[in-house]
């Protein structure tokens, strides 16, 4: 099973996160399938590769809680079909 989750980057006390598609059994810093976004909580900046995110969501990937909140704020779920909005 694939999840969309955050992968920590940056230095000490200045964390930034990559949003990655990763296998459930991998650890947080493990090898990802694909990088699909970027999130900086300090500057409150977000970059999302929406076509890649939609591809993984259509294939059955489950976003974690934090990633789901980021995607809701960016209104990514509105681009999914009405039969695939099980994340709202």
Curated annotation (Swiss-Prot):
Keyword Ribosomal protein: yes
Top-level taxon of origin: Eukaryota
Keyword Plastid: yes
An example Gene Ontology molecular-function term: structural constituent of ribosome
Keywords of this entry: Chloroplast, Plastid, Ribonucleoprotein, Ribosomal protein
GO cellular component terms attached to this protein's record: chloroplast; ribonucleoprotein complex; ribosome
Location within or outside the cell: Plastid, Chloroplast
A Pfam cross-reference name: Ribosomal_S16
A single BP term in Gene Ontology: translation
Family: Belongs to the bacterial ribosomal protein bS16 family.
Official protein name in the record: Small ribosomal subunit protein bS16c
Natural source organism: Helianthus annuus (Common sunflower)
């Amino acid at each position: 099973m694939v999840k969309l989750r955050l992968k920590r980057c940056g230095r000490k006390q200045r964390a930034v996160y990559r949003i990655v598609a990763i296998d459930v059994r991998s650890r947080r810093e493990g090898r990802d399938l694909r990088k699909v976004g970027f999130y900086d909580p300090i500057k409150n900046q977000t970059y999302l590769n929406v076509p890649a995110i939609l591809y993984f969501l259509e294939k059955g990937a489950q976003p974690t809680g934090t990633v789901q909140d980021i995607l809701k704020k960016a209104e990514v779920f509105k681009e999914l079909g009405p039969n695939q909005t099980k994340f709202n």
